[in-house]
């Protein structure tokens, strides 16, 4: 599946960081096209290396693939939600990179959980048994079930889909789609002994994903190897309150931005507190757009800023699937104001884009009548410095020969929006 070329007006709207439904739709299409390409690549690799797979791994993969295809016929939109869930992307990247042998077979086994999640979401009846070699059945976007026996039994009934460890250690009943809570409900989906369900943050459909093993690639990501926090270290009440307040703050100063954040993000992944030293508050994985990896900020306004920042990392990662913005093999590195280490041009572009969105937000916060007073003071103190740093980064980008024609057009659009916030890009001598 190849997404349609991006219209010039959509590229221009994205460059300005301002929310637009048409832009969001184009980016979602790009994410799905990329996900389908990776899934097809996994199928092709598995088919070509059939003779190198063990008989159990090959059989289980074929069964899981058949279940996924059947679920797609029942509910294509619901299956798409599972395939486009951020951790599915992290898994696909890990599976395609795994060396042939036991490591690859372990990655292939995860397709069973993806297929079961798709069937549950689509309301497709699922029966039979599945092998779970890791001892943990992971249903992306839904939850996890421990399976010490290494096998699960599946069955349908009036209450929904029943999943049980073959040794009787754990079970879950996941309700049919019509029986699930709607958007904005914070209670978890499903019930049962040993079942741990993902929880939905208040006021929307974004999950607080503190369970999925693929929510960060091992051994972590980013400077200092940022680690995902496990559920015992993720206080649900604090996250829910801070999330609700952050959304209220965003809505008061920039309602469109609040809506966009809820539409682009699919999950928030809590990060563990660092052992020592300062580390970034958030991150976005290129393989998992739509997931904001965030260490719980001290205030709701800081969380609101992190959400806007990570939303724009997702937007740019998805846009780059539609139209490459930087050429290959660039070796030059540059200093930017928000990082202590030199960055290559693609990273400068990512940082400049996310910080331009943050500059736009602070511009509205400091002048908005509905802004929280403490947040208005913070925005006023930091706006000028960040505006200057973004301007310098835009100048570096425009002087670089590593941008593609579309990338140059995009950065010029960023510069125009930056100028509208009160300053033009600085000339670098």
Report the location of each language-model feature.
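Type-3 copper protein
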Residues: 1-269, 295, 384-429
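Short, flexible loop/turn elements at secondary-structure junctions
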Residues: 254, 272-274, 296-298, 312, ...
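Short, glycine/acidic-rich hinge or "gate" loops at secondary-structure transitions
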Residues: 259-263, 267, 324-329, 368-379
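Catalytic zinc-binding patch centered on the HExxH motif and its immediate surroundings
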Residues: 268-288
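Post-HEXXH active-site segment of zinc metalloproteases
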Residues: 284-287, 297-306, 314-346
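Short, well-ordered loop/turn and helix-capping segments at boundaries between secondary-structure elements
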Residues: 313, 317, 321, 360-367
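Post-HExxH zinc-binding segment in Zn-dependent metallohydrolases
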Residues: 331-374
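Domain-exit/linker segments immediately C-terminal to small folded modules
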Residues: 352-357, 367-403
């Amino acid at each position: 599946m190849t997404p349609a070329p991006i219209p010039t007006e959509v590229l221009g709207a994205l460059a300005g960081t301002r929310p637009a439904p048409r832009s969001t739709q184009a980016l979602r299409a790009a994410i799905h096209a990329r996900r389908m390409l990776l899934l097809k690549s996994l199928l092709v690799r598995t088919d070509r290396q059939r003779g190198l797979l063990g008989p159990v791994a090959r059989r289980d993969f074929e069964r899981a693939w058949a279940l996924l295809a059947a679920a797609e016929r029942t509910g294509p939109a619901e299956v798409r939600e599972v395939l486009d869930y951020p951790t599915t992307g992290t898994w696909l990247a890990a599976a395609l990179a795994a060396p042939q042998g036991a490591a690859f077979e372990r990655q292939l086994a995860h397709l069973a959980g993806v297929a079961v999640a798709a069937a549950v979401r689509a309301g497709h009846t699922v029966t039979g048994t599945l092998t779970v070699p890791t001892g943990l059945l992971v249903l992306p976007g839904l939850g996890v079930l421990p399976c010490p026996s290494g096998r699960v039994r599946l069955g349908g009934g009036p209450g929904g889909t029943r999943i049980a460890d073959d040794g009787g250690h754990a079970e879950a009943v996941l309700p049919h789609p019509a029986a699930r809570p709607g958007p904005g409900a914070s209670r978890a989906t499903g019930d049962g002994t040993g079942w741990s369900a993902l929880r939905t943050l208040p006021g929307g459909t974004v999950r607080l994903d503190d369970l999925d093993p693929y929510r960060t690639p091992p051994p972590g990501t980013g400077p200092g190897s940022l680690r995902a926090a496990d559920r015992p270290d993720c206080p649900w009440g604090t996250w829910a309150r801070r999330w609700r307040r952050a959304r209220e703050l965003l809505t008061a100063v920039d309602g469109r931005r609040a809506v966009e954040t809820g539409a682009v993000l699919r999950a928030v992944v809590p990060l563990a507190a660092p052992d020592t030293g300062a580390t970034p508050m958030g991150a976005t994985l290129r393989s998992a757009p739509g997931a904001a990896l965030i260490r719980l900020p001290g205030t709701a306004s800081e969380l609101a800023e992190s959400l806007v920042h990570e939303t724009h990392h997702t937007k740019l990662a998805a846009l780059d699937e539609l139209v490459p913005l930087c050429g290959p093999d660039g070796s030059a590195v540059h200093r930017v104001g928000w990082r202590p280490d030199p960055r290559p041009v693609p990273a400068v572009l990512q940082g400049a884009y996310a910080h331009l969105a943050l500059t736009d937000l602070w511009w509205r916060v400091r002048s908005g009548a509905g802004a929280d007073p403490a947040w208005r003071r913070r925005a006023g103190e930091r706006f000028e410095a960040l505006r200057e740093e973004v301007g310098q980064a835009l100048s570096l980008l425009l002087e670089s020969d590593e941008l593609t024609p579309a990338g140059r057009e995009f950065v010029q659009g960023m510069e125009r929006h930056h100028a509208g916030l009160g300053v033009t890009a600085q000339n670098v001598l």
